[in-house]
Amino acid sequence: MSLLIFLLLALILLSLMAGLLRRLPWLAGLVVALGLGWLAWGLWRAPLEGNIEMLGRTLMQNLPNQLLNFSFQLTPAIRAPILLLLFWGSLFALAAALLKTERILFPAIPILLAALILFLGSAPLLWAPLWLMLAAVIMAFIAQGNQPRSARAALRVLLAPILAFPFFLFAAWVFSQSAVAADDPRLWNNAWKALIVGMLILTSPVPLHGWITALGESSSAFAGAFLVGVWQIAIYTFLRRLLFTYPAITDFADPGLWLPWIAVIQMLWAGAFMFGSQRLGQLWGYLLLWMYGAAFLAWGLTGELGSEAVFWLFLVTPLVLTLTAAGLQSIAHRFGENPAYEKLHGASERMPLSTLGFIAGGIFLLGWPLGALFPMRLATFQVAEYRAGNIFLWAMLALALGVLGVIRAARRLTSPLQDVTLEREPAIAAWTIGVLLAAGGVIALNPGLLSPIAQQLLIWFNML
């Protein structure tokens, strides 16, 4: 049996176990968190060459698997993003179990990770977005949840992969017909343009990724944060493979030029709407969009030289996201999902740690000092100032608008108590947020703590 098949079967089994334990969501979340953590630990320790032993079975690592004319292989290059996905899944499952979030999240996390692993390990490369559409369908179920709510987020999550896939399909057809394309240079040029358009769609021009903002208003806090994070890891990996496989893309449109502008437009869009937000969920959605753009801005400005920093970012971001989502989830339990600002009276008095978690997590995501992401955000802005002055100025404006948006929400959360029957935050929520705050503080004081892990992931990732 190949290691890839074992990994997929283990994820499916975890999903089934979580489904059977749906009446005990805390136990289902704990099982998923431990299972994903065990898989991540086993994959981290596994050597690159030769067979490995897991659960008494001999697993072949680089053995390709065939399905529907696709080839799937767990190469060293995709080991790094798979480890990141497993880490994100384990952390979010554990935090969501402690905070009593929606039950559908726990069986859906392993299935979504399995679909994303198929997407990352599939060949031919230009057909891989077909599996991304499958992952998007699963993401839609997670976004909708098991409560009656608007279907905006669930429907919008399907938009980008469905629109991007035909462009990759056209490019794949032209590249497979090289003899025909050689006689028609326009066809060849159109194929490269189609490939670039597909990349543009997946790197999220704002109108096509309204699902990110809709997640804040129409999904649970943990579901929104998890979906945005794992999507970005998968897209980053796919686009990097594209650039290595088809380096001629840079002759038509250099990503080092257009990617930073797309990212800063997202940040500006998000910052402006964060400043004008009237609901807590709305602020959360635009905060996720700002974070998404900031990660691609870091990659676009630094290119391959910043790959280690990008991996460090993907290691630290889930800690800050779970902190913010935990605070928001606890507040939503008392004030309802996506509460309006005018209803948040007394939140800081009755739920001090939940309020602190949301406010601190929000400004830490923006890169505020004392936060775990401060070193990365500072480095990104310094590179922008050195390499692209215009982008730096727009990024500073986006940052200022985002900070003002969080401050507006903080003023509402700290308003005087009006309803004396408002319950206090659960002790488990307070302890969870406290631990996450402490973990973020440790990383902020010692940013190099995770550097060895990021370096090892980069070594594997460079084995393309």
Where do the PLM segments sit?
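Structural signature of hydrophobic alpha-helical transmembrane segments
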Residues: 1-10, 72-85, 124-135, 186-201, ...
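Transmembrane helix-loop-helix hairpins at membrane boundaries of multipass inner-membrane proteins
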Residues: 1-6, 12-98, 106-107, 453-463
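Alpha-helical multi-pass transmembrane bundles of energy-transducing inner-membrane proteins
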Residues: 20-26, 107-194, 200-205, 274-340
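Small-residue-rich segments of transmembrane alpha-helices in multi-pass membrane proteins
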Residues: 32-44, 109-120, 138-139, 157-173, ...
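Short helix-boundary/re-entrant hairpin motifs in multi-pass inner-membrane proteins
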Residues: 63, 195-261, 285, 362
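Interfacial segments of multi-pass membrane proteins
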Residues: 142, 295-302, 376-392
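Predominantly late transmembrane helices and immediately cytosolic-facing juxtamembrane segments
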Residues: 315-338, 353, 390-425
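Cytoplasmic/organellar membrane-interface segments at the starts of transmembrane helices
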Residues: 348-354, 403-464
